[in-house]
UniProtKB/Swiss-Prot annotation:
The keyword NAD does not apply. Belongs to the PCNA family. SUPFAM superfamilies: DNA clamp (SSF55979). This is DNA polymerase sliding clamp. Sliding clamp subunit that acts as a moving platform for DNA processing. Responsible for tethering the catalytic subunit of DNA polymerase and other proteins to DNA during high-speed replication. One of its GO terms (molecular function) is DNA binding. Homotrimer. The subunits circularize to form a toroid; DNA passes through its center. Replication factor C (RFC) is required to load the toroid on the DNA.
Amino acid sequence: MFNAIVSADTLQATLDSVSVLVDECKIHLEEDGLEIRAVDPANVGMVDLRLDAAAFESYETDGGLIGVNLSRLEDIAGMADAGQLVHLDLDEETRKLHISIDGLEYTLALIDPDSIRQEPDLPDLDLSANIVIEGKDIDRSVTAADMVSDHIALGVDATDELFYVDAEGDTDDVHLELTRDDLIDLTPGDAHSLFSLDYLKNMNKAIPKDAEVEMELGEEFPVKMHFSFAEGQGRVTYMLAPRIQSE
């Protein structure tokens, strides 16, 4: 059993955070909220999302697991204005999700969860540097790097206590530095890793510009990014594997 009412903007933010990496996912219906974990087909980008029951206008479930086509569900959610409420009701016999938006009625066929890619285990990494940065500064960094390259280096200089972004193209380069004063917080440790810009651009689309994003970095290690949405009642962790640089 699953029956819920949620604001369209909260639902859209939830779907956007996952759909930047995958087209379909499993949703765990827990009594205290929803949980989603997914990895892209290349095993490069992972997402771990939690949306508390308190983020909903109403939320009832006795637990369960459903599989959804994210693009179809996003299209339906996109029919609602930001302030409108979306009613979700699971028909367990037909394995369909009934969706109501201000008089519009949709019936979405669900996917067999067993046919969806296995969920990843996000490794517990001991990363040397930790920063807290505004979402708009991530957006600025990604936009600047995208002008010159398809890769982006993220790093922390522990001596100078700053976070930096490097992108090297065939002819042009971009370098951006943010000092301790520019950041919300900084726990310095030497870190430098190179990443695919395409993945970071996609993740950036889902990060609110006014969000406080905690970023964990190491030396040729994955980057982890954590942020909240839905007034703190939703939480997302992204993990992006690095491109290993040859000597």
